[in-house]
Amino acid sequence: MDNARFEDQLAAGCRALGVTVAADLGPRLQRLMSELLKWNAKVNLTAITAPEEVLEKHFLDSLAVLPEVTGAATLLDLGAGAGFPGLPLKLALPALGVTLVDTVGKKVAFIKAAAASLGLQGVRGLHARAEGQPETEGIPRAEVLIARAFMDLPDWLALAPAYVEPGGRVVAMLGKPQTDAELAARAAERQLRVVSARAYRLPFSGAERQVAVFAKE
């Protein structure tokens, strides 16, 4: 995928998702892709390696939740894997402080290397396991907690509140959309409330997604 096609596909994807990004995001995402594919040739970071799929399934899927994250000062990405959604969100929102946590050391090493290569400030990669004890785990709380396909929603809502600052929110990036009633029932089980929920499709494959936001009652 050449630079012009990447830029065209990024612009088309963002339009389809209804998100607005800065003009310099394209080149920075291309650098991130280059780092990802270079590392992935040596260590297994992701099964998604075709540039078109990296753009859609990693980058655009991450950027789709910009409306749910914009305005926050800090973001905690649990189960970040190779840095998604945290790294694309950081590139789109430079002032956002981002901590990305994963249990796999090589993925955290990549996150740190990619952040250094891109000259990102306010990004921290953390090799840790989140089990609901942030103080002992060394995981900082954040205004927004996010995860993409990290665990089933009931387990996520059981774990997440421990990592959210007072007044903060929990964002769940889901594959199969759930009904409003299902989301409300899951939230109530953990003394949470549903702030918002919306379904969307990835712009090229049409894959279904949903993003739901929760807050403490």
Curated annotation (Swiss-Prot):
Lineage start: Bacteria, Pseudomonadati, Myxococcota, Myxococcia, Myxococcales
Catalysis performed (reactions): guanosine(527) in 16S rRNA + S-adenosyl-L-methionine = N(7)-methylguanosine(527) in 16S rRNA + S-adenosyl-L-homocysteine
Residues noted as binding S-adenosyl-L-methionine in the record, renumbered to the chain: 79, 84, 130-131, 148
Function as written in the Swiss-Prot or TrEMBL entry: Specifically methylates the N7 position of guanine in position 527 of 16S rRNA.
HAMAP family reported in the protein's UniProt record: 16SrRNA_methyltr_G (MF_00074)
Protein name: Ribosomal RNA small subunit methyltransferase G
GO CC terms, sorted: cytosol
One Gene Ontology molecular-function label: rRNA (guanine-N7-)-methyltransferase activity
Subcellular location, principal: cytoplasm
Keywords of this entry: Cytoplasm, Methyltransferase, rRNA processing, S-adenosyl-L-methionine, Transferase
Assigned protein family: Belongs to the methyltransferase superfamily. RNA methyltransferase RsmG family.
